[in-house]
Amino acid sequence: MEEKILMRVIVITVFLFIGAATAEDAAAEAYESPKLKKLITDCTGHVGETCSTTTSSSGSEALMQKQDGLALCLLDSMERCLLDHQTNVGTLGDLIILPPFPPRPPVDPNIIPFPRPPNIVPFSPRGRRSKLDNHQTDAGTLGKVIPLPPIRPGPPLKIIPFPGTNIVPFPRPPNIVPFPRRRRSKLDNHQTDAGTLGDLIILPPFPPRPPVDPNIIPFPRPPNIVPFSPRGRRSKLDNHQTDAGTLGRVIPLPPIRPGPPLKIIPFPGTNIVPFPKPYIPHSYNTITNLLGARRDQVQDLPLLIQTTQLRTVLGICSHVTARTCLTAPNVATSDLEACLTPSMNQCVYPPGAESGSPPI
């Protein structure tokens, strides 16, 4: 339970810090709507009654925990109340919902937005004659069409050396030794012209290899090795169909049986606690609900800015109200309920808000 409370406090503190940094340069028009002011005024009484069960306690640490818990209760209850009162989306339409953009004029298909410059010779993509070559297009659209003559093949290239040089082909080096092959080639049979390749060096054929004795194993396996087939099936060695004197003693292994499932044994004095699910406060769903109420309307940057300004003001005022009402001496339950409503209204709508100054 303490971990959940600590997680909620951390989440709301980080969110309020980001919101305060975002709303430093924000204008006051996001919370000066008279309709929204009436809704917040009506909701503060309900919020004060809901969160007034939190009583003050002695000690600075306990007091800070109470302040954070009360601030979270104020913010969450305020947004719940706003959502309950705005079942009709038209109530906050001037603040949240933006009108759609005007429709664009229809495009005339006869108007070419980017005409081609004149004196351009068109070519078909595959080199064939296109319709432009047959003069089947409107000359006023593309300008004057200049047909080009076909490209004729020219004479073959001829290498012309510099004056005083002779083109001599690269001669073959003499004394080429042909490599012997497994089969006898024509060079071994002396069926080539020796004057063409120069002095040929004929190598004698390799001596034939001695026959291989099948009973001799060049690399014997060490003893006490249990062979396995590559696919896990039983091979001939498992059936004892080989010569035991060649491979040594074959020791068959028993099959591996599946063991019991693993069990996590914690250290003495510790308890295995599953990782808690992340706490998502109700305030996170407020923007989604407000934006998803009217899918046919345009949602752009001003809409997000106004929503962020509104949530920032409510978040900051929740902390200010909690700090103001809980630090007063000898605060009882009835006094706390009476303190929440005027403190919340004064923070959200201070006297300078009508003149355009920021609330905090």
Curated annotation (Swiss-Prot):
Signal peptide start and end residues: 1-23
One Pfam family linked to the record: Nodulin
Annotated keywords: Nodulation, Signal
One GO BP: nodulation
Domain of life: Eukaryota
Induction behaviour: During nodulation in legume roots after Rhizobium infection.
InterPro entries in the cross-refs: Nodulin
Region entry Disordered, spans: 123-148, 228-249
Family listed: Belongs to the nodulin 20 family.
Full protein name: Nodulin-44
Organism of derivation: Glycine max
